[in-house]
Amino acid sequence: MKNRQNFLKKFEVRQSHVPRFNEECGVFGISGTKDAAALTALGLHALQHRGQEGCGIVSYDGNSYHSERKFGLVGDNFTKKHSLDKLKGKIAIGHNRYSTTGGETIRNIQPFYADLHGGAISIAHNGNLTNALLLREQMVREGAIFQTTSDTETIVQLVARSKKKDILNKIIDALMQIQGGYALSIIANGTLIGARDPLGIRPLVLGKFKNAFILASETCALDIIGAKFIREIENGEVVVIKLSLIHI
């Protein structure tokens, strides 16, 4: 009995040594409604458990992008009307940050925005890229300048460097070069785009609210606004939504 107790003690797993499960960021996107920013804020509120370090929303009004990124919780930053009034447009994406890579700085809070050749892009990303450091080092040697320490910027840089002609194919070209788990909600040239990694490691669902289509990390973000769940985005799938039209 004593030997058995010693054996069990040797392999005892202490709670303090077990890594906590963290959802690691939440993403949301919606296209086709004048209330895009407000509905994005509600969706992020439902996804708050996925990240509490910071939150952000980027909207597009047909001509310009509008961005608000803050430290703290969604309820502390996006419940007042004046905050949402700045975020005009029928398309919006949002992000709750739980830092998996990069430090606690406002620059690392998403969605990121970049004005690229071929069109502007804003991106919200949940996941970890296993080859991000390698790609980053390679691009820095070739002259790239990074503004953040987040692996998400690696995707933006790859899109910027792509030789493809249009922004959608630039994004697909970038996705072909990254490894790891990811779920993306992107605005590019007035279009909402969703993408999920080939293994489906990170969740991403498609929903509909009236005439608007929605991308979200979980169905709870659909439930809070009364949206209908359509299906999960499939492994390795890229979905393109332009206002109320969807192309797969």
Please identify what each model-predicted range represents:
Residues 1-245:
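Conserved short alpha-helical segments that host acidic/polar catalytic motifs at enzyme active sites
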